[in-house]
Amino acid sequence: MKQARRLHHIFDLKRDERLSAIGDGLEHLGTHIEQLMASIEQLLRKGQKSAAGALQAICLEESAKVLILLDITRTHDQRIARKGCDYFYSHLPRLIYAKVHSSNPADFGEIEGYLTWLRPSHYLDGPNDVDWIWRNELLRTRENALYVDYEETDDGYMWTGGDPDQFYIETAATRLVLAMKRAGLLTERGARAAAAAWKVAEFDSGTRWEFCRDKAREVLEAALPSDTVPSESLRDDVHLILEKWTFPLLSLDLKEEPVSMETLKERQDRYLSRQYGTDDYY
């Protein structure tokens, strides 16, 4: 029997069944991420940094899928929530999810601002901010961790990727998701708690991060059994969740923004014209 990717099918289910299906998915992902992390730690102990980096890249995107599923439960406008199914299967939206949750945005507007530099397919950088043309940094880092390739650069053609000294995989989103697992959020009960806490939540560009912290506290109080005696490690997990679990992102456009090489080269030429007065020769 053909097994096709069908996350969109959850929107054909009644709300109660949908939350149950999401809870099941959260549990599967949580277990998978935990196992990946155990393998990563074993590889690092053996000094196999390249293999560990490749698994870290996979683990990061699996962690982002957890955050996307939770956002589907936290987003009650179904038209917006459905976007989560597209983001669930796309590399860049998943990487943006991970990047946002590794930062400390003061408000929702700051997250909106992040997208101006996280989404473009190519960008200019260098000592003068226009010296070199780079591919999207998030995608480039992912590919360098997973693949070896022969690429054209401003310095000519060269082999890239596979060298752990040439890339860094941010693990903050994975740490957050594992904390959520230990706190009982990656369950059907956790999915229902998230949905209930955010049911009438409204926010805009000026909404402060403390709004998310208070909502996260509501979710934790509903998800954890009332007789839970918090250990020191659980307190650490709760603190991390309260600090790092930010706004739902499904209302934002997280897809790659195409930027042509011609456009960037024109910007380089304009800079050179202004800087060195080359216009005077024409």
Where do the language-model regions lie?
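Start-of-helix signal in alpha-solenoid helical-repeat scaffolds, especially tetratricopeptide repeats
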Residues: 26, 33-34, 57, 143
